[in-house]
Amino acid sequence: LSARYQLDGTELNTSPSIGIAIAPRDAQEVDTLIRYADGAMYSAKRAGRGQYRFFDPSLNRVNIQEFQFEQRFGEALRQHQFVLHYQPQICVDTLEVCGYEALVRWQHPEFGLVYPDRFIGVAERSGFIVPLGMEVLRLACRQLAAWRAEGLDTGVAVNVSALQLFQPDFSAQVLRVIAETGIEPRRLELEITETAVLDREDVAIANLEALRDAGLGISLDDFGKGYAGFAHLYSLPITKLKIDRSLIAQLSNQHDDSLIVASTITLAKRLSLRVVAEGVETRDQLICLKLGGCDVAQGYHFSRPLPAEQVHDFHDSFTTTPVA
């Protein structure tokens, strides 16, 4: 199957992935055998090109579920099974709500409410992250428009994947959604990771520059996790820096991470960037961030991500009695 062959004068080669299920050892029903073989094939694909795998219940349980997710992505999109929850972002100085981050969930008919750690990786590997990302953007913009009509003026941050940024017309698609929903561009912020712009930096930066120039906020997410460094920030058209929760987790007045976070905030300010801290869970962490000059905090200390219908009540009650 891997042999090279000619097609219309062009030499082609394939790298097959094969999944094998055996009857009656694995199952006797045809549909079950096919499903198990599909799951084994998915495991073979993840192992690399030109591989084969036998069905193994103990090793392939997770892979089979991921394969099932991949097969149902299109149906889920058509049936509007993806929903957004919104985690508040709080101004550190005033303790007022200054916006929300939109986080996608899958209201799965079989598995219930599925969190993104179970399907985003599959979506990225399969390429489905591109239509899913646009669906998330549309949902967030529609919700912003609905809130504004109800008298709630706020902003929403939406995560964007590398594959989306690599689409030459990505910025045009985003601006089209903004125009269709009638929201103010300044109310929308896109969160990216540094690795998202490394492979095709020219295309990604062109998209980001067009969106920033249109009035959108651009936030660099997960800063302090992995590759990200200040040397690369000068070339990125960003307006905000988001410190990763791994640096916030151990934050206290006595901990060395306090100096790291404070230095990060200081350097970001010199680049005229606003700073967001994610994963804030304690009052001590909030105090350290306030002393360090952080602009915005987000985390369970304030609230878990909320369904859209609960945001109004949270917004009103937090404005009246903020968490300190």
Residue ranges and their predicted role:
Residues 61-72, 78, 124, 128-133, ...:
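Signal-transducing alpha-helical linker
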Residues 2, 144-148, 178-179, 205-213, ...:
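Surface-exposed amphipathic alpha-helices with a cationic face
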